[in-house]
């Protein structure tokens, strides 16, 4: 029996079984879920209705994640699935789907922050000393002009210190073959932190 997306096989609102008056149709077909896991990239191309293509990601290990408040996107490694609003089984099996909360590598964003603002992350305005060559006056002026915008949420700063950031997957890995999303910040971050906190 193929997977179908029709509703004729469902009981009616009053609980009556519906009579079968036609067979399944091609335009009602469904396919098995991709259950995208974390691992070396493996993507299958699927030919779909109209001759179009879908990209079924079976394994992914990285994606493009954006840092909304800073307006920057970086390709970074996906470490693990931390929470899923619909199913704990998807967390246990590290399955990547849309709206999964994942932990990503913070390094690309930390490097960008420290070069953009010229200060160390979480150092309360301390200058970055990692570069041996002195900065030009022009670059110093740029950095000092940007310093006012360099405030980072304390919860986010804690994650940067640990080297892992919480992010939401906003693409559909089983449809587009990509695992892209955005870093959790502000109210949304605090909401999910409360959900992930161990129950008393």
From Swiss-Prot:
It comes from Schizosaccharomyces pombe (strain 972 / ATCC 24843). There are 2 genes for eS8 in S.pombe. Component of the small ribosomal subunit (SSU). Mature yeast ribosomes consist of a small (40S) and a large (60S) subunit. The 40S small subunit contains 1 molecule of ribosomal RNA (18S rRNA) and at least 33 different proteins. The large 60S subunit contains 3 rRNA molecules (25S, 5.8S and 5S rRNA) and at least 46 different proteins. PANTHER family: 40S RIBOSOMAL PROTEIN S8 (PTHR10394). The keyword Nucleus does not apply. Belongs to the eukaryotic ribosomal protein eS8 family. It is found in: Cytoplasm. InterPro entries: Ribosomal_eS8, Ribosomal_eS8_CS, Ribosomal_protein_eS8_euk, Ribosomal_Se8/biogenesis_NSA2. CDD domains: Ribosomal_S8e_like. This is Small ribosomal subunit protein eS8A. One of its GO terms (biological process) is maturation of SSU-rRNA from tricistronic rRNA transcript (SSU-rRNA, 5.8S rRNA, LSU-rRNA). Residues 135-145 have a biased composition (Basic residues). Component of the ribosome, a large ribonucleoprotein complex responsible for the synthesis of proteins in the cell. The small ribosomal subunit (SSU) binds messenger RNAs (mRNAs) and translates the encoded message by selecting cognate aminoacyl-transfer RNA (tRNA) molecules. The large subunit (LSU) contains the ribosomal catalytic site termed the peptidyl transferase center (PTC), which catalyzes the formation of peptide bonds, thereby polymerizing the amino acids delivered by tRNAs into a polypeptide chain. GO terms for molecular function: structural constituent of ribosome. GO terms for cellular component: cytosol; cytosolic small ribosomal subunit. Residues 1-40, 123-145 are annotated as: Disordered. Keywords: Cytoplasm, Ribonucleoprotein, Ribosomal protein. Pfam families: Ribosomal_S8e. The keyword Ribonucleoprotein applies.
């Amino acid at each position: 029996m193929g997977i179908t997306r029709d509703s004729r096989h469902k009981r009616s609102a009053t609980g009556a079984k519906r009579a079968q008056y036609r067979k399944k149709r091609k335009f009602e077909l469904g396919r098995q879920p991709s259950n995208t896991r974390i691992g070396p990239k493996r993507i299958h191309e699927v030919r779909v209705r109209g001759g179009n293509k879908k990209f079924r990601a079976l394994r992914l290990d990285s994606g493009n994640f954006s840092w909304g408040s800073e307006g920057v996107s970086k390709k970074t490694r996906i470490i693990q699935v931390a929470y899923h609003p619909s199913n704990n089984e998807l967390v246990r099996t590290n399955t990547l789907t849309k709206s999964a909360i994942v932990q990503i590598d913070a390094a690309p964003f930390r490097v960008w922050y420290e070069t953009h603002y010229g200060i160390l992350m979480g150092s309360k305005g301390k200058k970055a000393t990692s570069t041996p060559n002195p900065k030009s006056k022009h670059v110093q002026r740029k950095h000092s002009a940007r310093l006012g915008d360099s405030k980072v949420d304390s919860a986010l700063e804690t994650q940067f210190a640990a080297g892992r950031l919480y992010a939401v997957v906003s693409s559909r890995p089983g449809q587009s073959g990509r695992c892209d999303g955005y870093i959790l910040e502000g109210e949304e971050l605090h909401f999910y932190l409360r959900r992930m906190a161990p129950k008393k």
